[in-house]
Amino acid sequence: MLTLKILVYTTIIFFVSLFIFGLLSSDPSRNPNRKDFE
């Protein structure tokens, strides 16, 4: 049960971090330096 719980928590943290990273990279107001590279 402990291994299953660790696997579930790891998957949740992985998807949450992907979601937050996607929001930060797609939001120009959060990341104004991105306009300089384009």
Curated annotation (Swiss-Prot):
Subcellular location: Plastid, Chloroplast thylakoid membrane
GO cellular component, one term: photosystem II reaction center
Keyword check for Plastid: yes
Chain segments annotated as transmembrane: 6-26
Keywords: Chloroplast, Membrane, Photosynthesis, Photosystem II, Plastid, Reaction center, Thylakoid, Transmembrane, Transmembrane helix
NCBIfam families given in the database record: PRK02655.1
Family listed: Belongs to the PsbI family.
Annotated PANTHER family: PHOTOSYSTEM II REACTION CENTER PROTEIN I
Name of the featured protein: Photosystem II reaction center protein I
Source organism of the structure: Phaeodactylum tricornutum (strain CCAP 1055/1)
